[in-house]
């Protein structure tokens, strides 16, 4: 009876050992199979993420370009304050000259009451 039990235990140990050796011998191929399986499952999702990221990158590059262009426009406007001051001075000078012309026409109308003015203007 002890012999049968011993033989059974020896058989179990040898079977386990044989199974372990078989697994160890075939483990690299199983690992490669699992790796291939994982890549096949994951790759479409990763490709989709990559295309999404490229699309977002293009959109963000467009937005960055727009913001940089707007910033340069604002900087150009702040640098043009000198030109606006010059324009303001010229407009004030033109208004002053127009008022002088209008007042001189008014005096000439008083001097020659027989002439009718060709153009009367109203200044606000």
Curated annotation (Swiss-Prot):
Keywords: Lysosome, Membrane
Gene name of this polypeptide: borcs8
Localization annotation: Lysosome membrane
Function as written in the Swiss-Prot or TrEMBL entry: As part of a BORC-like complex, it may play a role in the movement and localization of lysosomes at the cell periphery. Associated with the cytosolic face of lysosomes, this complex may couple lysosomes to microtubule plus-end-directed kinesin motors, driving lysosome movement toward the cell periphery.
GO cellular component: BORC complex; lysosomal membrane
Region of interest called Disordered, as start-end residue ranges on this chain: 102-124
Description of the deletion phenotype: Borcs8 knockout results in decreased brain and eye size, reduced muscle size, motor axon defects, anomalies of neuromuscular junctions and impaired motility.
Family as reported in the entry's similarity comment: Belongs to the BORCS8 family.
Domain of life of the source: Eukaryota
Transmembrane segments: none
Organism: Danio rerio (Zebrafish)
UniProt-recorded name of the protein: BLOC-1-related complex subunit 8
């Amino acid at each position: 009876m002890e012999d049968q039990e011993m033989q059974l235990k020896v058989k179990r140990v040898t079977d386990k050992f044989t199974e372990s050796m078989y697994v160890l011998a075939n483990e690299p191929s199983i690992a490669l199979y699992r790796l291939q399986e994982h890549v096949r499952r994951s790759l479409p999702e990763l490709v989709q993420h990559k295309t999404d990221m490229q699309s977002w990158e293009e959109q963000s590059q467009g937005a960055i370009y727009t913001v940089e262009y707007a910033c340069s426009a604002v900087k150009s406007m702040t640098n043009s304050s000198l030109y606006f001051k010059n324009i303001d001075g010229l407009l004030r000078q033109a208004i002053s000259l127009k008022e002088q012309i209008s007042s001189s026409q008014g005096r000439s109308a008083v001097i020659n009451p027989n002439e009718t003015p060709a153009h009367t203007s109203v200044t606000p």
